[in-house]
């Protein structure tokens, strides 16, 4: 499923993501825009691992896809569940990622497109 920007923002807000570990709702929406363009089915292969779903969660550290050597699976989930339309496990795993010392900087797309930028446009016009 490709989520509408505002629909996605509303789901995140309901799930307690606004301000979670100091990350504003607009930053989360910016991150997902640039990682997956709000597409739950997004898959991107890297050398030795793969990124899955709307937040592009990586199989080396966070989920198990059964084909990544020495995978940690810190979110204790199958990567497959990150590709369905239900965002609850994606959100729980994203929360787990930002609890690490690196926080939201774990996402390259956030560092490239959202860090130190005016991200208010990502939730502008959304009824939140």
Curated annotation (Swiss-Prot):
SUPFAM superfamilies: Lysozyme-like (SSF53955)
Domain spans labelled C-type lysozyme: 1-128
InterPro entries associated with the record: Glyco_hydro_22 (IPR001916), Glyco_hydro_22_CS (IPR019799), Glyco_hydro_22_lys (IPR000974), Lysozyme-like_dom_sf (IPR023346)
Species this protein is from: Sus scrofa (Pig)
Record Gene3D superfamilies: 1.10.530.10
GO molecular function: lysozyme activity
A single cellular component GO annotation: extracellular region
PANTHER family assigned: LYSOZYME C (PTHR11407:SF28)
Protein name per its UniProtKB record: Lysozyme C-1
């Amino acid at each position: 499923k490709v989520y509408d920007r505002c629909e996605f923002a509303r789901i995140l807000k309901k799930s307690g993501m606004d301000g979670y570990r100091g990350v504003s709702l607009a930053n989360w929406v910016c991150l997902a825009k640039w990682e997956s363009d709000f597409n739950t089915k997004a898959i991107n292969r890297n050398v030795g691992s793969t990124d899955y779903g709307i937040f592009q969660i990586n199989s080396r550290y966070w989920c198990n896809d059964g084909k990544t050597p020495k995978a940690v699976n810190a979110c204790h989930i199958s990567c497959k569940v990150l590709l369905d339309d239900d965002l609850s496990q994606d959100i729980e795993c994203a929360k787990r990622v930002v609890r690490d010392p690196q926080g939201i900087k774990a996402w390259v797309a956030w560092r490239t497109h959202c860090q130190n930028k005016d991200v208010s446009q990502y939730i502008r016009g959304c009824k939140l």
